[in-house]
Amino acid sequence: MIYCLSKTMEISACHNLSLTYESKCSRKHGHNGEVTVYCATNRKNDDGMVIDFKHVKDRIHGYLDHGDLNELLPFNPTAENIAEWIVNEIDCCYKAVVKESYGNVAMAIDDEFPIDPKFLM
């Protein structure tokens, strides 16, 4: 049996990007976006869960929401880098989707996740 879950959260945060080209994104600005975390396992924990939704929310939303991402994260806070950070930050997370704004979406997928992707959400 494979168990999957997803947790979607709204995130409001500011950042500026360090880029190799001229861009208005190099100036401090904010986003009201959305993050979805996907987790899976073939063995539920002792409480009968993949992972507690509150744990995911506390770790991601509680850390990033209304924060300055440049101060909170040790990397250039692009949507792609944030998605990768989430995958590495949450146990059993195999995919993270970061919607920085309408139409702008980045995703990171753990290509070494031990469950066959065809069984995942």
Task: Briefly describe each language-model feature range.
Residues 1-121:
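Charge-rich, low-complexity N-terminal segments
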